[in-house]
């Protein structure tokens, strides 16, 4: 029997931090850009190429994969999972980044506990309910719930 290759988690040197960022360890952060006044909770993974906007809060056990951009003043609750692999060929991409898709979350959006976010665009001010599975773009500010996520209630446009 062979010995496993052991890899440590932590904060790699290629992470770019803004001012006054708070990180609760343990975390796994690498190759990402984190804006000013951001809070990252414990047991969070943020992968390469991710951008997190100013004043955003990412709570424990969230997984933010490559290809995700999160705007300013967002709330990402506990256990939120972002997914970039749509199994376009009937199975996992197995690291083939050409098959991965991106996700964009607009300013002021909130994502509830345990939500799953597939490669989509979520508009500014949208609220995704706990446990929702977002499979399509959200283009109108509102509360979205269920699997697949559907509009429950319209919200005022941000800034109005």
Each model region followed by its residue ranges:
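Flexible, glycine/small-residue-enriched loop-and-beta-strand segment within the central core
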Residues: 1-13, 23-122, 147-156
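Detector for the N-terminal beta1/A-loop initiation region of ABC nucleotide-binding domains
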Residues: 16
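Phosphate-binding loop/pocket of nucleotide- and phosphate-handling active sites
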Residues: 160
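C-terminal/domain-terminus segments
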Residues: 123-134, 143
């Amino acid at each position: 029997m062979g010995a496993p290759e052991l890899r440590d988690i932590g904060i790699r040197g290629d992470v770019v931090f803004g001012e006054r960022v708070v990180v609760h360890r343990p975390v796994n952060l690498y190759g990402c850009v984190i804006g000013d006044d951001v809070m990252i909770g414990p047991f969070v993974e943020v992968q390469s190429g991710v951008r997190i906007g100013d004043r955003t809060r990412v709570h424990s056990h969230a997984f933010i994969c490559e290809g995700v951009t999160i705007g300013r003043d967002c709330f990402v609750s506990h256990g939120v999972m972002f997914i970039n692999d749509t199994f376009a060929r009937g199975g996992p991409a197995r690291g083939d980044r050409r098959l991965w898709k991106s996700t964009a979350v607009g300013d002021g959006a909130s994502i509830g506990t345990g939500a799953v976010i597939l490669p989509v665009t979520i508009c500014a001010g949208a609220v995704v309910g706990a446990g929702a599975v977002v499979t399509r773009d959200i283009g109108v500010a509102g509360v979205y719930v269920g699997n697949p996520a559907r509009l429950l209630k319209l919200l005022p446009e941000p800034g109005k």
